[in-house]
């Protein structure tokens, strides 16, 4: 491994890399862009899908006490009135009296980021929900909202899931999907945007067990980021003071990542108590509770909620993985992404475009594709192709050379060490899978 170079412009380097290599682009760029909106390119869509798949594997696939849900994005006002969003889902908005720009008051430290003025209007509550009309007839009866979080669909489906899965507390409902918040000051690339993807789980527990499960999920979710390659010193836990808690929370702890602008929220774990189920039960008239046959009693479960942003997590993984190494006197950019997150796990690289070599290379590609995501690259020198794969985070490169035609073996190159190993084609799939764990 080469000598590590100190990096002081990490955010700019990663966002430039993201655009140049096809991780994400400003949306509607040919029309001048659309603030706070991004389109995920060929590499980014793979990474984002891998982040969501890794979360789903950890939270649903590897457990028997959590099931999945995909609830509607559009919802009627009744849901958001009951949840408290119509009244309390706000940020403090101020206008700069000098340049007229609008800002979120608690994020600017009394100084306008645009012009430096310290003169602002009085703060006023700005609701972050997107309001729209459903159907062809305008009026209050047609009002709908884009969901600002995925959580409420899991609460309103509590009784449905309880009845159809025969689960009993403690159990969870998990969901991955788009949410929308009309942020006053979207910023820092894909970190804070108005359209984003969430990965949330509502874990329903007996009230007496809530604190135990709250601590359990803090530890479990913190460990997930470590297992996927984020260094311990890049993460910290921030427990909210009582005065800072959301209206529904009995306790909240954020997992924070050391972003280039400082530590900021990556995921929040909250003890929501029985607030949500009680609110929706009162508003709808439907009992949202569990009957404990063993003790012959009904109770409203408490809810422990680990809530993560998929797009925000993707950005943290990219920032944590980016390095510049000096290898053999040359500087290379490399994304040391965990193999489960990399856009491609393997790149198949024929040494030449000659038909017999390309034919064998496509045979090798066909062996690998059922097992891992593969790139196939014929262009430029092999050294440049290695550097390209390093820069996009591909853990392994498989090179097919002219000796391969004779000995039915290929060269497997490691992204992180640049070490190369000769492997028989018959053993390639097993070797690759073993190295990608």
Task: Tell me what each language-model feature is.
Residues 1-437:
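NTP/phosphate- and nucleic-acid-binding module
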């Amino acid at each position: 491994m080469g000598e590590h170079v100190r990096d002081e412009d990490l955010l700019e380097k990663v966002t430039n890399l993201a655009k140049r290599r096809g991780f994400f682009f400003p949306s509607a760029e040919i029309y001048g862009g659309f603030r706070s909106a991004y389109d995920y390119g060929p590499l980014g869509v793979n990474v984002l899908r891998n982040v969501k798949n890794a979360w789903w594997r950890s939270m649903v696939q590897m457990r028997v006490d959590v099931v999945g849900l995909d609830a509607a994005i559009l919802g009627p006002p009744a849901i958001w009135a009951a949840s408290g969003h119509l009244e309390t889902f706000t940020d403090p908005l101020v206008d700069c009296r000098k340049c007229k720009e609008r800002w979120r008051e608690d994020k600017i430290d009394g100084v306008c980021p645009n012009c430096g003025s310290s003169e602002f209007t009085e703060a006023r509550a700005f609701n972050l929900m997107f309001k729209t009309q459903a159907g062809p007839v305008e009026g209050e009866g047609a009002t709908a909202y884009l969901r600002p979080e995925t959580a409420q669909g899991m609460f309103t489906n509590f009784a449905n899931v309880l009845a159809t899965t025969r689960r009993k507390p403690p159990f969870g409902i998990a969901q991955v999907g788009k949410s929308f918040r009309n942020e006053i000051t979207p910023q820092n690339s894909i970190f804070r945007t108005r359209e984003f993807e969430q990965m949330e789980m509502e874990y329903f527990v007996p009230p007496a067990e809530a604190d135990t499960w709250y601590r359990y999920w803090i530890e479990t979710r913190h460990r997930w980021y470590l297992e996927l390659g984020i260094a311990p010193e890049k993460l910290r836990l921030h427990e909210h003071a009582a005065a800072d808690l959301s209206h529904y929370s009995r306790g909240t702890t954020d997992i924070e990542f050391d972003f280039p602008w400082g530590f900021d929220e990556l995921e929040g774990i909250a003890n929501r108590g029985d607030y949500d189920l009680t609110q929706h039960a009162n508003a709808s008239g439907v009992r949202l509770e569990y009957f404990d046959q063993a003790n012959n009693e009904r109770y409203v479960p408490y809810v422990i909620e680990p809530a993560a942003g998929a797009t925000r997590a993707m950005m943290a993984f990219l920032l944590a993985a980016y390095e510049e190494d000096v290898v053999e006197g040359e500087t290379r950019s490399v994304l040391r992404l965990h193999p489960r997150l990399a856009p491609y796990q393997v790149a198949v690289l024929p040494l030449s475009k000659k038909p017999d070599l390309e034919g064998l290379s496509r045979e090798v590609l066909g062996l690998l594709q059922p097992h891992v995501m593969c790139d196939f690259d014929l262009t430029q020198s092999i050294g440049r192709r290695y550097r390209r794969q390093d820069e996009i985070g591909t853990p392994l490169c498989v090179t097919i050379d002219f000796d391969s035609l004779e000995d039915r073996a290929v060269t497997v190159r490691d992204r992180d060490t640049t070490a190369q190993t000769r492997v028989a084609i018959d053993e390639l799939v097993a070797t690759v899978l073993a190295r990608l764990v």
